[in-house]
């Protein structure tokens, strides 16, 4: 998908209005507990400032439900951003209105202003055209660098593009399109996809789209038990979507018909309850005990999956292998994370999409050892499903 980017436009002396994703966690003392999303936007921000642009940033934060709520003010973000840039960041009182317009017009080359939370106005999520038009009037160039909200047609992502002369992608979105797009359109092979998580229902569209692209699919997480039950195996008390058994069978048949190597676990870690103090042991999937719950993939499966990952040239991972939030049930997920890091160092392209997988990579301190970690949970999932993302479709080709 070829879209014009920040590199294609002249920004010197221009008011550049950029949609970013500054939806960061903030504690009760107004401290930002994780500034990853702010840091990720810095390349685009610095490009505009250093190029003499007059930067106006906009974002949402939390869910203020269309009303002004001081708890969701972006002021702490302006403060943190000014520390990271070592330059003042003006905090606007609102995101539209005369006062904001005057402040935007008063900006000098290389100066930065952050607008107040877009979602203080219900019109943002409703994609109200008047609101979009008013936002658009603040800038001369629009840049979207918020991949995490690209799957939403909101005023600041989609509506605004109808009222600006220039609408381009920032570096963060460009990077997402390069990695996710290349993996789906023109991957180096073998291409292995690893899908985890608890429900098949959340991954049907991803599976069906990937069946047209990949060579091998490795399945983990609780969704394996729906596949096993569909094959007539005993799954004890493991999580199963009983209304998706036919679908599971259909997916297995579809993979076989398309010549996809779809692998399921050979062994699983089981426990009587999902709790940190529960004792656990490994069982073969064809002889699971009654009353037990599958909580992770077992050692044989880890080895089997690791070998597939290390033989791949492109690896895409979405979803954990087990209940990785509990340390005793996290081994499979961390083993996959380590295998991805190993594959990367051997020259494979490795892509991680989805919040849980990214969290596992971070917890294993391997974030720097992966080619690309997607910044958008829902957006990357919809992209992998082959769906058009309104916030990106709307940008200039």
From Swiss-Prot:
Pathway(s) per entry: Carbohydrate degradation; glycolysis; pyruvate from D-glyceraldehyde 3-phosphate: step 2/5
Enzyme class: transferase
Sites where the protein binds substrate: 21-23, 37, 60-63, 119, 152
EC number(s) reported in the record: 2.7.2.3
Subcellular location: Cytoplasm
Keywords assigned by UniProt, alphabetized: ATP-binding, Cytoplasm, Glycolysis, Kinase, Nucleotide-binding, Transferase
Keyword set includes Lipid metabolism: no
Family, as annotated: Belongs to the phosphoglycerate kinase family.
Assembly mode: Monomer.
PANTHER family: PHOSPHOGLYCERATE KINASE, PHOSPHOGLYCERATE KINASE 1, CHLOROPLASTIC-RELATED
Protein name: Phosphoglycerate kinase
Lineage of the species this protein comes from: Bacteria, Pseudomonadati, Chlorobiota, Chlorobiia, Chlorobiales
Gene: pgk
